[in-house]
């Protein structure tokens, strides 16, 4: 009887203490969301990497219904965690593992529905048992948790030691290896999927930040230095962890590396004790984005063709599917615009910002995409995205939307082409038809209802290169996505134009 009474007072106390703490584990990329009766400031919701729990019990004659999170580290022993156990006479507890699965009502344990027929007084021996039992069990739980944490730490340190002893890693980061050597190794590696994770961590944690060069909705972009070379460091805020993970994942797709796609170097999460910084390290291009470049400079016909052809080459490589054991899935960008294309020293483009990209698995014919039709920048959205008629289950639909946006980028480039001393000032597409920050409704009215497109000047017809560019733009802007050019067709047309204009690529 003493043991039963001790458990009766201990388990409700543990459940109440756990509910008071919110029970949330470390936030992860796929955190589990649970109902939480004590999380007033978090809208009665908590996040965990473990399980959701709901429990009902009587304490001092009062009925308590508790919902909370159980961190993964506290789900011990495996398969039958203490926190998830019920007792026929003491409490009713249920653990589950899907979002908000603990929003259920449990029945009060049957033992609490009956009044004891023969109440008895507790003697000294019973009191000792009541006090000692819960204390012993609490110490047992603490010891188990400590052993589990210690085990995971030993496994982690062993992995680090193995990484450091890996001769391939030692070779990758020998002291005389420069940034140029590292980039060359990336370009010539067989997998084309990036550096080993250990090397990425080491590179990221030895970069010295120099100056901030840009800001966006995700965070900041810095110029950094590593072994005498410049790198670009995109620093995500902690609330953008999903975006950081997604972009790093896309950049490390097998066979993605291409001269016209921004070169990925490393990804790392840096914890300074106060907050976590999420880093994405890539090649640095001093000209910045195509948007910045066109605002500062005009371009020659040769420069226009190089920019347009390299952008088409990068997009064609993204869209292309390579079948085989070392194959590459088709990738659609979904946020193509002049601010997401960088200009290299040689006047060529490199497509960047793949955080919203989707990949297509040709074997299963599936697309890894969140169920959200409206993404990207409103000004560059294709008609089918604006009016929500895009077929989200068909990968070609996303490629067609990219082509529409590429046509708008070409319009921005061609306006800045200096032909015979004539050029126009830089403007964004639809600058004369919508406000500086247009809404979906404003863009839909112009693009879908009125079927308007950016103006192509008549004087472009006087120059073969501008005439070809204008014709391609119109074929990129068709309302019917299936009628638009493909990236590969655009690349071939511009390659022929470069030969005609004697452009050295």
UniProtKB/Swiss-Prot annotation:
Residues 207-497 form the Protein kinase domain. GO terms for cellular component: activin receptor complex; cell surface; plasma membrane; receptor complex. CDD domains: STKc_TGFbR1_ACVR1b_ACVR1c, TFP_LU_ECD_ALK4. It is a single-pass type I membrane protein. ATP binds at residues 213-221, 234. Changing residue 206 to V: Leads to constitutive activation. The active site is at residue 335. Expressed in many tissues, most strongly in kidney, pancreas, brain, lung, and liver. The chain crosses the membrane at residues 127-149. The GS domain is a 30-amino-acid sequence adjacent to the N-terminal boundary of the kinase domain and highly conserved in all other known type-1 receptors but not in type-2 receptors. The GS domain is the site of activation through phosphorylation by the II receptors. This is Activin receptor type-1B. It comes from Homo sapiens. The gene is ACVR1B.
